[in-house]
Amino acid sequence: GVIRCLSDRDGWSAKWYDRMKKPVLEAPEALQSIEEASEHLPDADELCLQSDPVATLQKGGRLAGLELLSNFLHERGEGYSKEMSSPVTAFDSCSRLSAHLAFGTVSMREVSLACERRRQQIKEMPRGMKGKWPSAMRSFSGRLRWHCHFLQKLEDEPRIEFENMHPDYDGLRENVFNDLFFEA
């Protein structure tokens, strides 16, 4: 997604499409490791932390990311466009790829290309077999672009991390900000 040192945003969308259409690079056969001693990292018990009651933690790693992607594109994702916004249905209907994209275990290009391949497969299905898949893949593809659009906006205008994007919002709520609510 992000293109560094753009002089302006004109043509960003076309550049994004061009980048996403390129083939995924092959992984290197080996990486040179760094020989460095590491200090002991304490575990939860040593830090006197309670065990985490969350039973549905996602598995990390590349294989888990690829499995989630495939499962979303072929099973869970059919209701995506209608179910992504509800806390009741989103867990099962969304891709759950955010952590994998953030940590780089899958790339935006991989996800985009896989989505496009799935869109083509769906297009070739008989009409009665398509279900809600065309809408789901269109919505998901749009969200991928939207994600990259806003990352690009942050790259081009880093001030928006701390300032309002539009100056008309300056002063709108500063006088009613409550530190206690924010910290909660």
Residue ranges of predicted features:
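Active-site "lid/cap" and pocket-lining segments within catalytic core domains
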Residues: 1-141, 151
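Aromatic-anchored, charged helix-turn/loop surface patch used as a conserved interaction hotspot
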Residues: 142-143, 147-184
